[in-house]
A protein has these predicted regions:
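C-terminal regulatory/oligomerization modules of transcriptional regulators
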Residues: 1, 119-142
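N-terminal leader segment of winged-helix/HTH proteins
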Residues: 1-26, 72
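Hydrophobic structural patches
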Residues: 8, 36-39, 129
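Short amphipathic alpha-helix starts
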Residues: 10-14, 60, 89-92
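Alpha-helical linker/hinge and terminal dimerization helices associated
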Residues: 11, 15-18, 98-117, 132-140
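N-terminal helix-turn-helix DNA-binding core of bacterial DNA-binding proteins
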Residues: 17-61
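Charged, amphipathic alpha-helical coiled-coil/dimerization segments
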Residues: 68-127
């Protein structure tokens, strides 16, 4: 397996496959679900541009889905003081049941990823990711 290409593709495909039944049940497109969950899980990133740049969803898909989510009452858009071009996206009460189900699904997905591993293996994995994260920070400094 090519860790640089195959693993991320497989991880994304598995996540989407796990999400598909819930998205069907809720009658919500995967991209709209991803946007809601991104906003719920990342409160420091609250604009459409953040979703494009951080979550790597194409701008046109973000635009169309944000418009529909706002129209359907799942998100609200408010102006950001000092920047007329940006609008803060926030989840409404109507979105909370979807977010709750989504968080359960994400935890279940995470648990499935670590099936057949020991607590020590999980701990080592987490520590290794932390080290890699710090190494990346150092690379980006210089």
């Amino acid at each position: 397996m090519n860790m640089g290409i195959d693993f991320p593709k497989k991880l994304t495909a598995a996540y989407n496959a796990v999400c598909k039944p819930l998205c069907r049940e809720l009658n919500i497109p995967q991209t709209a679900f991803d946007i809601l969950m991104f906003l719920a899980n990342n409160p420091d990133y609250s604009t459409a541009g953040d979703i494009v740049n951080v979550r790597k969803i194409k701008a046109n898909l973000v635009s169309v889905n944000v418009e529909k989510l706002a129209k359907d009452g799942y998100i609200e858009r408010t102006n950001i003081e000092g920047d007329r071009r940006k609008r803060r996206l926030s989840l409404t009460e109507k979105a909370q049941p979807i977010v709750g189900r989504g968080k359960q699904l994400q935890q279940s997905f995470f648990d499935m990823l670590f099936e057949n591993t020991t607590d020590e293996m999980k701990k080592n994995f987490t520590e290794t990711i932390g080290i890699i994260d710090r190494n990346l920070d150092e690379m980006l400094k210089g």
